[in-house]
């Protein structure tokens, strides 16, 4: 899902079970909302092209990956792993909302918003794609996406010797309570999460081109502010793929 400033606000993000934000080319970020059940997606977008840093996260789960267009690296990954029809490259027959108005009052119909900020898809389109292409969506998973401690056992995990402990001195204690989290993806793209004790959730905000922080909202859900019970920040190396400097395609080191 597009997250360049001009594309905001997005649709459908509040229904995601997991929302990933990762830096891509040019210092911008994009979102990948992950849904357990595609029937609950509603409308989602603006849909943009696929990148391998997102694809590699969902690859072990054999999830349906929907996007519009893809980088050459992403395309090669899909070929190498024989992802077939699970890699959808047209937004599940995505459609244009030429009249959508962004946060700054700009629209494609008014000649002030680029075309790439206007594509959306929805649960019906996804269902039609799955049905018409006979895509196998049956999965049996033996674990969750992240390996959390089972809260029902009342135990904690000793992280003192974990790989994350290397970040303790620089970024603060790994397991401390977080009232405020700010992530600087690049000089222009920053995200922060503010903890609300009354709800036990974090409210998401993003920095805009005018220097102001604004709530991240889902305009398909009456501008509902995105909130999360858990925020996970993954520290890793991100750099340009050798040979892809012209388009600044980013490689994310996951292992």
Outline where the language-model segments fall:
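A surface/extracellular/periplasmic glyco- and lipid-processing/surface-interacting theme
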Residues: 1-20, 25-255
């Amino acid at each position: 899902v597009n997250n360049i400033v001009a594309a905001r606000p997005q649709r459908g993000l509040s229904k995601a079970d997991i929302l990933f934000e990762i830096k891509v080319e040019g210092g911008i970020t994009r979102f990948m909302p992950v849904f357990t059940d595609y029937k609950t997606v509603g409308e989602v977008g603006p849909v943009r092209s696929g990148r391998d840093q997102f694809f590699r996260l969902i690859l072990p789960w054999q999830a349906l990956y929907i996007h519009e267009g893809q980088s050459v690296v992403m395309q090669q990954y899909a070929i190498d792993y024989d992802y077939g029809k699970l890699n959808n490259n047209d937004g599940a027959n995505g459609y244009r909302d030429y009249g959508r108005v962004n946060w700054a009052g700009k629209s494609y119909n008014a000649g002030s918003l680029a075309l790439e900020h206007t594509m959306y898809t929805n649960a019906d389109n996804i269902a039609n794609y799955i049905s018409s292409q006979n895509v196998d969506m049956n999965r049996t998973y033996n674990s969750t996406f992240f390996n959390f401690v089972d809260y029902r056992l009342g135990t904690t995990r000793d992280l003192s010797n974990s790989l994350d402990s290397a970040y303790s001195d620089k970024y603060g204690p790994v397991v401390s309570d977080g009232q405020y989290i700010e992530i600087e993806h690049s000089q222009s793209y920053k995200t922060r999460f503010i903890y609300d004790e009354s709800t036990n959730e974090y409210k998401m905000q993003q920095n805009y081109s005018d220097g102001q922080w604004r709530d991240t909202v889902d305009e398909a859900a009456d501008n509902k502010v995105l909130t999360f019970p858990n925020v996970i920040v993954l520290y890793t190396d991100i750099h340009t793929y050798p040979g892809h400097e012209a388009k600044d395609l980013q490689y994310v080191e996951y292992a």
